[in-house]
């Protein structure tokens, strides 16, 4: 027998020691088996993917492709699922793996987003690094219950005379802006955002399907007016996948809801929902959903209604915050009776219609007062507006009809001519340059002057200069009254007389100044 061979006792001791060491090592490991459900891509199209092998996947669940590319489950059939991609699909092909995540899509929210330009997933587009958001909220959330809502009671001042006086918007309201291309829809939005600089309103601008150059111009304007500190800009460009365009307005709404739940006032602008509807139509047709009117799927009304219903004013017990929604719609050939415009008109609390006819005449902003309405905001107007412009909407509409009638060459009596001249001056006063939102006192002074006849003796081409002189005089001479108007105090009879006296003095002083200059 070989003496070098270990004895049975030694071998047993060695094995016991080895297994003991192995047990000690294994006991220190917390290895857990992780179940991953992985399927296979069967088809890749323009912004959509079909896959199989995911029997337990849920609708609207987030899935991951190779390279951490993301998708959202849209269709769930017996043998395959339809996925909308949130990234470009160049790196996805038939046979690629697709993995479940077990969670729904969410977006970053919080103060860290202010001043940033992001895509709908919360990824930065401004080259300023990742967003350090402390929380994330789901893309889709239930709208507040009826008993959680409070009446809309506080005005949202746009700084635009014709809107604040005739088509007022309240905080928590949904007001649609619609009109043809190049009629000034985005210009109204920019002025509204600029006017919130001292109003404690957080503004979220959501660009959907717009050209990158157009969005860059919007960002540049907001930067130049130093509005970005209270703004969030969410961008899904026209060259982005349609899936990213589809989720963009929902992402912007979730970002706004975070602040609303904390008692803050939020303004969310969707620019525009026409492109959003087209992106949804494209995805639905590619995924073979049954088309309806104008090839839109049957739930096109629902996808906008469920989003805009999240805009509201909460009860004080829930913080008293508000989310005001201003969707934009692009019409074709001034047709506001098309499918998507009529859907949005029926969902929202009013609409502001921009007329290409007025735009071509140089009447800016080109708001058609007769076709515009605010079903909620009128109750929120500051008392001073109701005092000076209570019947202005009716009288202005009558003036427009009278002006149309007078073009037929009918002989007019003195009273009719006087109404026409007054109406033309009202129209001149309601004109306003872009990027020049006015404070409440400036608007009240101008409106009171024109409705009381203080500008009847001024030629139309000099109305703008006279308005500026009146506003300067009111700020210099009546600063206390301006502060009271801003606070929402009503105008007394004495206040009206004081304002009118200052306006008439400012108007009368101009010819004297010219005479002094000429001499």
UniProtKB/Swiss-Prot annotation:
GO terms for cellular component: plasma membrane; proton-transporting ATP synthase complex. It is an enzyme of class 7 (translocase). SUPFAM superfamilies: C-terminal domain of alpha and beta subunits of F1 ATP synthase, N-terminal domain of alpha and beta subunits of F1 ATP synthase, P-loop containing nucleoside triphosphate hydrolases. It catalyses: ATP + H2O + 4 H(+)(in) = ADP + phosphate + 5 H(+)(out). Its EC number is 7.1.2.2. Keywords: ATP synthesis, ATP-binding, Cell inner membrane, Cell membrane, CF(1), Hydrogen ion transport, Ion transport, Membrane, Nucleotide-binding, Translocase, Transport. The record marks 372 as: Required for activity. It holds the Pfam family ATP-synt_ab. ATP binds at residues 179-186. It is found in: Cell inner membrane. Its main location: membrane. The keyword Nucleotide-binding applies. It is a peripheral membrane protein. One of its GO terms (molecular function) is ADP binding. InterPro entries: Alt_ATP_synth_F1_asu (IPR017710), ATP_synth_asu-like_sf (IPR023366), ATP_synth_asu_C (IPR000793), ATP_synth_asu_C_sf (IPR038376), ATP_synth_F1_a_nt-bd_dom (IPR033732), ATP_synth_F1_asu (IPR005294), ATPase_a/bsu_AS (IPR020003), ATPase_F1/V1/A1_a/bsu_N (IPR004100). The keyword ATP-binding applies. HAMAP family: ATP_synth_alpha_bact. PANTHER family: ATP SYNTHASE SUBUNIT ALPHA, MITOCHONDRIAL. Produces ATP from ADP in the presence of a proton gradient across the membrane. The alpha chain is a regulatory subunit. F-type ATPases have 2 components, CF(1) - the catalytic core - and CF(0) - the membrane proton channel. CF(1) has five subunits: alpha(3), beta(3), gamma(1), delta(1), epsilon(1). CF(0) has three main subunits: a(1), b(2) and c(9-12). The alpha and beta chains form an alternating ring which encloses part of the gamma chain. CF(1) is attached to CF(0) by a central stalk formed by the gamma and epsilon chains, while a peripheral stalk is formed by the delta and b chains. Belongs to the ATPase alpha/beta chains family. This is ATP synthase subunit alpha 2. It comes from Syntrophus aciditrophicus (strain SB).
